[in-house]
């Protein structure tokens, strides 16, 4: 087995400035002086950095691979262990360098896809007598917990170290692959399960360190020799400055763990390079523990440091370059992991036996010489035993065979032990015995298993606690929603109650209004009945009045008959008086004719004519009296109309007084009004009596005047004689004609005036009767006092009766309102009871529904717990993946595959039967 000391290959790559740096005013601060040197000119420091190779912003993915990684693939196929990992701040392009934009993009794919393709290309182009098997595994270190990305349910795997296997992850799923596409499928599956998140520096920032492990075993089928090489492809999470990334919450916790593990990596590199440390802290972080062989051990390591050229990230760029400079000074001791063939073992055995025989002969010669010397004798110099000239050199058969390969389980002699001082710098200063070391490793593995078990239990408890908290939060949210819904329902119920109460109040008001209207209707009905009764009374009084009027008409007719007895026309145009006047005129004409004929007028005729003239004078006087009485009757009619108007006004005032409640002041006012009306009526009656007396005196004077006129006419007749009569015959005739016309008009008016006179006489009789009654009532003071006392008692009784009626009606109304309120309250109680029953039923339904949902959630939780426990405890949790993926798929060189090997992996689809939900996916893997 060959061993060679080599340094870590460090390659620096600078990406172009991104949008954030340009918007922040960043300027390029890096200049490239050659293919391996760059100069940084920043505010903090200036200087040049030299690495194995420096790539500027315009480099391609293929340039990185051809210079940096392609030799590493050849070393893996030659039986060496190899490591390629990218280091740098977040957003510096590590994942882009390792994975690229897409696996299927020939130009944009990164280092890992190109390595896979190069491996299978080299296998197919190798010799036909070499048989290869390729295994891959994919894991991430998230929050200092190792998680299998191909079996995400295994999220807390322990790190073990054994003498034969070295450092490895226990329980990590390894999949046999036979083609590039199968490896790509595994990478896609694992990449989808990887944790990523968005920060201010990167939209899809890796929140974990991912490690993709490729193990290649090769065997020479002719000689039986074997080699194995293991390649670690590490995509480190970027170091973060919280002020720039804006991390908070879970992202901040992830950043803390990332920076802690990167700090542990820096401490390991410092311990390996300072030359003073007696202890290398590999166990401070699971990342450094897994990469223990890659840092100062049995591995050929390539470090790609990714940097930003902008002044915005100058501090991070300087830190990354200094990290690369320190890592470059680490010395690894890579060895070929070889397994010897039987022929080589026989050859080594023969050589060992020859050496043993030589040693035994040499020992015998030395012992005999020593005995001589001890016996006090001297051995001649020429008889001294010569020094052993046999050169003990290790066999070089392993290095001379054509590309041998080691199996997965290495022999103790095939690898350097981890703590050996000669193999790695910084191992413990006190070496352990072989047995002590094995016991130490065994004890360490047990403790690691216990720690992993306890961490799994703690993680399960934390997960259960988190789920319980989430469930509690969900329940609280549900409770808050129910509370809000309850408050909303309560508010709606209160609104409905207010509306109901408002409607009830409006209903009560409407009912009270209806009751008031009913009362008003009853009052109006009573008033209507009273009005009807009054109408009946008025009809009765009208009948009585009509009877009185009939009696008055009868009296009027009788008086008219008496008054017009002397003027009865008996249906003709002229009455008896008119005919008498006409006869007198005719007789006067006859006498005029006799006198004109010259005949003597008989004295009897003159006497008869004189009597008729006297009678005619009476008629004239009567006509004048009738005319005067007509004028006086007009005045009396006007006065009567005024009296009737005053009487009607008094009656209206009396009705108004009766229609309202009378107080003592009202009573006094009524008494005053009655006294005033009586006094006014008495004054009117007295005035009327005086006027009638004056009329009588006037009539007497007129009668005397008429008598004087009659006497004068008589004298004139006597003095004039027949000559006068004959001279004035024609004039008298004309006067008689005029008198006849006037008489007709006077007779027409006479009848009307007689009617008025009769009416006035009747009214005068009634007034006299009323006046007499007033006089009688005014004279009876005792009776008036008694009537006043009775009226007061009647008024008091009426008032008390009215108050009692009002109180009774008010009490009836209050009783009716109270009954309605009681009925409304009972109805409201019944409605509230029904609403309470409905709400209780709804609450019971909601509780039942919630219990069903809670039971379903608990069932799903138990099922998830049972499924995760089955996935961790048995291989059945891996599905068909654990069966097909663990079947070796040997590959032959020369472009031919071993019979039975397939180009596809049908068990990949069953790798993750229950893919985790809400996992952040990587932008490097585009599902095809």
Swiss-Prot record:
Occurrences of domain Kinesin motor (ranges): 7-330
GO cellular component: cytoplasm; kinesin complex; microtubule; microtubule cytoskeleton
Ranges of compositional bias, category Polar residues: 905-928
Coiled coil: 343-866
Function: Kinesin is a microtubule-associated force-producing protein that may play a role in organelle transport. Its motor activity is directed toward the microtubule's plus end.
Lineage of the species this protein comes from: Eukaryota, Fungi, Dikarya, Ascomycota, Pezizomycotina
SMART domains tied to this protein: KISc (SM00129)
Listed name of the protein: Kinesin heavy chain
Alphabetized GO MF terms: ATP binding; ATP hydrolysis activity; microtubule binding; microtubule lateral binding; plus-end-directed microtubule motor activity
Family note: Belongs to the TRAFAC class myosin-kinesin ATPase superfamily. Kinesin family. Kinesin subfamily.
Organism, scientific name: Neurospora crassa (strain ATCC 24698 / 74-OR23-1A / CBS 708.71 / DSM 1257 / FGSC 987)
Low complexity compositional bias, start-end: 395-409
Free-text domain note: Composed of three structural domains: a large globular N-terminal domain which is responsible for the motor activity of kinesin (it hydrolyzes ATP and binds microtubule), a central alpha-helical coiled coil domain that mediates the heavy chain dimerization; and a small globular C-terminal domain which interacts with other proteins (such as the kinesin light chains), vesicles and membranous organelles.
Subcellular locations according to the entry: Cytoplasm, Cytoskeleton
Recorded name of the encoding gene: kin
Any single GO BP term: cytoskeleton-dependent intracellular transport
């Amino acid at each position: 087995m060959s061993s060679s000391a080599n340094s870590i290959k460090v390659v620096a790559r600078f990406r172009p400035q991104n949008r954030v740096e340009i918007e922040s005013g960043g300027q390029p601060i890096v200049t490239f002086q050659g293919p391996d040197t760059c100069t940084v000119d920043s505010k903090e420091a200036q200087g040049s950095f030299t690495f194995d190779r420096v790539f500027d912003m315009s480099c391609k993915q293929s340039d990185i691979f051809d210079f940096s990684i392609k030799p590493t693939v050849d070393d893996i196929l030659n039986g060496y262990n190899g490591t390629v990992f990218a280091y740098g701040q977040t957003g510096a392009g590590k994942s882009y360098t390792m994975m690229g934009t897409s696996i299927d993009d020939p130009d944009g794919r990164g280092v890992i896809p190109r390595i896979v393709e190069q491996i299978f290309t080299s296998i197919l182009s190798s010799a036909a007598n070499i048989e290869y098997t390729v295994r891959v595994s994919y894991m991430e270190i998230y929050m200092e917990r190792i998680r299998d990305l191909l079996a995400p349910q295994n999220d807390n795997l322990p790190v073990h170290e054994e003498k034969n296997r070295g450092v490895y992850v226990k329980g990590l799923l390894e999949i046999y692959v036979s083609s590039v596409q199968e490896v790509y499928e595994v990478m896609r599956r694992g990449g989808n399960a990887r944790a990523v998140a968005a920060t201010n520096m990167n939209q899809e920032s890796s929140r974990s360190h991912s490690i993709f492990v490729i193990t290649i075993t090769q065997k020479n089928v002719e000689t039986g020799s074997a080699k194995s090489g293991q390649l670690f492809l590490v995509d480190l999470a970027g170091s973060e400055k919280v002020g720039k990334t804006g991390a908070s919450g879970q992202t901040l916790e992830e950043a803390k763990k990332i920076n802690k593990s990167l700090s542990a990596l820096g401490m390991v590199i410092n311990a390996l390079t300072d030359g003073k440390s007696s202890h290398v802290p590999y166990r401070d972080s699971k990342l450094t523990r897994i990469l223990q062989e890659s840092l100062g051990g049995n591995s050929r390591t390539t470090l790609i440091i990714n940097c930003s050229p902008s002044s915005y990230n100058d501090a991070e760029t300087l830190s990354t370059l200094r990290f690369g400079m320190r890592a470059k000074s680490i010395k690894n001791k890579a060895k070929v992991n070889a397994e010897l063939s039987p022929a080589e073992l026989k050859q080594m055995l023969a050589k060992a036996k020859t050496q043993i025989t030589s040693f035994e002969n040499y020992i015998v010669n030395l012992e005999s010489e020593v005995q001589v010397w001890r016996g006090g004798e001297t051995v001649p110099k020429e008889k001294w035993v010569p020094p052993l000239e046999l050169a003990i050199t290790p066999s070089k058969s392993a290095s001379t065979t054509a590309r041998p390969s080691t199996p997965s389980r290495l022999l103790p002699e095939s690898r350097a032990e981890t703590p050996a001082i000669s193999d790695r710098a910084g191992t413990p200063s006190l070496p352990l015995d072989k047995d002590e070391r094995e016991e130490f490793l065994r004890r360490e593995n047990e403790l690691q298993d216990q720690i992993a078990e306890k961490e799994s239990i703690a993680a399960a408890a934390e997960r259960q606690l988190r789920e319980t908290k989430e469930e509690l939060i969900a329940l609280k949210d549900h409770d808050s929603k129910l509370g809000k819904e309850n408050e909303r329902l309560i508010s709606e119920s209160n609104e409905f109650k207010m509306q109901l109460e408002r409607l009830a109040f409006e209903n009560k008001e409407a009912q009270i209004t209806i009751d008031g209207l009913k009362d008003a209707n009853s009052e109006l009905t009573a008033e209507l009945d009273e009005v009807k009764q009054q109408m009946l009374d008025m009809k009765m009084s009208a009948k009585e009045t009509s009877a009185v009027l009939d009696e008055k008409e009868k009296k009027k007719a009788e008086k008219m008959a008496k008054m017009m007895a002397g003027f009865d026309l008996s249906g003709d145009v002229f009455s008896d008086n008119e005919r008498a006047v006409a006869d007198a005129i005719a007789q006067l004409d006859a006498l005029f004719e006799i006198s004109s004929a010259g005949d003597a007028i008989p004295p009897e005729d003159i006497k008869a004519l004189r009597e008729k003239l006297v009678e005619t004078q009476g008629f004239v006087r009567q006509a004048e009296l009738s005319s005067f009485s007509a004028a006086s009757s007009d005045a009396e009619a006007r006065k009567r109309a005024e009296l009737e108007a005053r009487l009607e006004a008094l009656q209206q005032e009396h009705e108004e007084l009766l229609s309202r409640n009378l107080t003592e002041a009202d009573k006094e006012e009524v008494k005053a009004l009655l006294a005033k009306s009586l006094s006014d009526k008495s004054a009117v009656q007295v005035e009327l009596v005086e006027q009638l007396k004056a009329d009588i005196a006037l009539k007497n004077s007129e009668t005397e005047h008429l008598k004087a006129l009659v006497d004068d006419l008589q004298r004139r007749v006597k003095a004039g004689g027949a000559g006068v009569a004959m001279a004035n015959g024609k004039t008298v005739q004309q006067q008689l004609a005029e008198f006849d016309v006037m008489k007709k008009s006077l007779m027409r008016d006479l009848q009307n005036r007689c009617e008025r006179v009769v009416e006035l006489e009747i009214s005068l009789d009634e007034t006299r009767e009323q006046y007499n009654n007033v006089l009688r009532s005014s004279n009876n003071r005792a009776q008036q006092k008694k009537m006043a006392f009775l009226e007061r008692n009647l008024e008091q009784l009426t008032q008390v009766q009215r108050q009692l009626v009002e109180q009774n009606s008010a009490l009836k109304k209050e009783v009716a309102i109270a009954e309605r309120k009681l009925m409304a309250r009972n109805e409201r109680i019944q409605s509230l009871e029904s609403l309470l029953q409905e709400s209780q039923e709804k609450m019971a339904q909601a509780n039942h529904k919630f219990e069903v949902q809670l039971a379903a959630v608990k069932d799903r939780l138990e099922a998830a717990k049972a499924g995760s426990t089955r996935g961790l405890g048995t291989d059945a949790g891996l599905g068909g993946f654990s069966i097909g993926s663990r079947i070796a798929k040997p590959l032959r060189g020369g472009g031919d595959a071993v019979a039975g090997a397939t180009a596809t992996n049908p068990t990949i689809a069953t790798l993750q039967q229950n893919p985790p939900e809400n996992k952040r996916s990587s932008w490097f893997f585009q599902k095809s």
